[in-house]
Amino acid sequence: MNAYPVSRLALDAGVSVHIVRDYLLRGLLRPVACTPGGYGLFDDAALQRLCFVRAAFEAGIGLDALARLCRALDAADGDEAAAQLALLRQFVERRREALADLEVQLATLPTEPAQHAESLP
C-alpha cells in the first residue's frame, strides 16, 4: 500500500493542504493509518476520492451532499449510497439541461454593441 501524508495527498490532487484538512473535518476523507506522531496517512483510494470530491464541488455539488454520499460509502450502506448517487446524477442532468439552455441563449445574443438612447437626437 502506498501511504503518504496530507501534503503529498494535496500536491497529487492539485489542491491546498487547507482544503484537504477541511474535507477531513467534514468527513469527506479519512486517513488509512497514522504515523507514530499522530499524522494521518492516505492511500491511492483517498487520492481518488479527493479528486472526485473536488471535481464534484467545482461542478456545483455542495459539500453537504458529498458528505452524505461519503458517509454512506464509508458505512458500506449500499442502499443509501445508491440513493445518494441517484440524487447526484439527477443534479448533474439538471445542470446539463441548464447549460444547454444557456448555450442556446448565448447563440442568440448579438455580437455587436447595442446602440442605445445616447445615439438618439
UniProtKB/Swiss-Prot annotation:
Keywords from the UniProt entry: DNA-binding, Mercuric resistance, Plasmid, Transcription, Transcription regulation, Transposable element
Gene Ontology molecular functions: DNA binding; DNA-binding transcription factor activity
One Gene Ontology term from the biological process aspect of the record: response to mercury ion
The protein's name: HTH-type transcriptional regulator MerD
Source organism per UniProt: Pseudomonas aeruginosa
The organism's taxonomic lineage, starting at the top: Bacteria, Pseudomonadati, Pseudomonadota, Gammaproteobacteria, Pseudomonadales
Residue range(s) of DNA binding per entry: 6-25
Every HTH merR-type domain range: 3-72
Claim: GTP-binding is one of the keywords in the record: no
Classification via SMART domains: HTH_MERR
PANTHER family cross-referenced by the UniProt entry: HTH MERR-TYPE DOMAIN-CONTAINING PROTEIN, REDOX-CYCLING DRUG-SENSING TRANSCRIPTIONAL ACTIVATOR SOXR
Coiled-coil segments: none
